[in-house]
Amino acid sequence: MTEKKARPIKVVAENRKARFNYSIEDTFEAGVMLTGTEVKSARNGKSTISESYADSKNGEIWLVNANIPEYLQANRFNHEPRRPRKLLLHKRQINKLIGAIEREGMTLIPLKMYFNEQGRLKLELALAKGKKLHDKRETEKKRDWSREKSRLLRARG
């Protein structure tokens, strides 16, 4: 029998601003409940998660405002691009996330959406706290200083 080759991880969408706008406390991997046309459209790589967030409703975690565009080859069976999508997590993880959202005022933001080795669409979620303006400036100053240091060290030799 021939063995199936492991597929490489394919990143579909990434939220690059998340690490700048939020201080990330913890990360989780969650499955996403999708329809067939959503999976095919996500494989095309045109999805965006930059304006999306995760919210809790009735003891479940939902991905809100993520854009998976309509699949061009699907006609009347197409999906709604910005519909809420249920996230698949263990009950213990769901309880931990809901507790952090309600008690500590934290936010659930998606960091990246990718297909794993089995071909399943996964979402990397982060439990994060929003940064204030002065925090953002501080991280920008640190980044600029580290760039300047590396330039000086390269110039010296």
UniProtKB/Swiss-Prot annotation:
One of the GO biological process terms: trans-translation
GO function terms (MF aspect): RNA binding
Pfam families listed in its UniProt record: SmpB
InterPro entries to which the protein is assigned, alphabetical: SmpB (IPR023620), SsrA-bd_prot (IPR000037), SsrA-bd_prot_CS (IPR020081)
Cellular localisation: Cytoplasm
Assigned GO CC terms: cytosol
Record keywords: Cytoplasm, RNA-binding
Annotated SUPFAM superfamilies: Small protein B (SmpB)
CDD domains: SmpB
Skewed-composition ranges (Basic and acidic residues): 135-151
Record carries keyword Membrane: no
Chief localisation class: cytoplasm
Chain intervals for the UniProt region annotation (Disordered): 133-157
PANTHER family xref list: SSRA-BINDING PROTEIN, TMRNA-BINDING COMPONENT OF TRANS-TRANSLATION TAGGING COMPLEX
Function: Required for rescue of stalled ribosomes mediated by trans-translation. Binds to transfer-messenger RNA (tmRNA), required for stable association of tmRNA with ribosomes. tmRNA and SmpB together mimic tRNA shape, replacing the anticodon stem-loop with SmpB. tmRNA is encoded by the ssrA gene; the 2 termini fold to resemble tRNA(Ala) and it encodes a 'tag peptide', a short internal open reading frame. During trans-translation Ala-aminoacylated tmRNA acts like a tRNA, entering the A-site of stalled ribosomes, displacing the stalled mRNA.
HAMAP family in the cross-refs: SmpB
Family as reported in the entry's similarity comment: Belongs to the SmpB family.
Protein name: SsrA-binding protein
Gene name in the database record: smpB
